[in-house]
Amino acid sequence: MLTTIEVFSDFVCPFCYLAEQPLADAADGGDVQIAWRPFELRPDPTPTLRPEGDYLQSTWQQVVYPMAERLGVPIVLPRVSPQPYSRLAFEGFAYAEERALGQRYTERIFRAFFVKQRDIGKVEILTDVAGELGLDADDFRAALESGRYAEAHQQALRRARELEITVVPTVLVDGRRLEGVPSAEALHRLFDGAVAIG
């Protein structure tokens, strides 16, 4: 029986990026499907963070870099300042998801921001990523510029609020949740419980 893991995340959250590997490891070889779901930590007009600020500098030095090293995941604190809003990237996700490319789009957007330090709040950067995936770049750009997926994104955010998601990443399996970067062991326990219940 297929188990669906819902992962609520924000493209500008390093912990969401770091959760990718444990999730992939836990899903590997199992009857598991990962479904990424949007959550904006700082929706417009809330000010976004600046990488040169004390908060991000200390968080990355004390927590993010050590965790990334333990997980073997390359990551850098992007120099993009201020950090971008993620709304457009999530509207692009809705476009990709409709074409069965949501997982690959998510992976590419995380890497664009946390490895290549690209400004994922810009339509042209998102369009480049879409083109790399083989999506119709002109149609993708037009979709973002026209707001074609704005309502789909807002519906996804409403669902997150209904589920009382307040922390990312949050992993849901059959109504049970894990918050923060999950270990592979915790994920396996979560899956095993879901299979036993199902």
Which stretches of residues belong to each language-model region?
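Hydrophobic "anchor" residues on beta-strands that sit immediately upstream
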Residues: 6
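Structural alpha/beta surface segment adjacent to cysteine/selenocysteine redox centers
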Residues: 17-116
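C-terminal cap of thioredoxin/glutaredoxin-like
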Residues: 2-3, 15-32, 36, 55, ...
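Short pre-active-site segment immediately N-terminal to redox-active cysteine/selenocysteine motifs
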Residues: 9-12
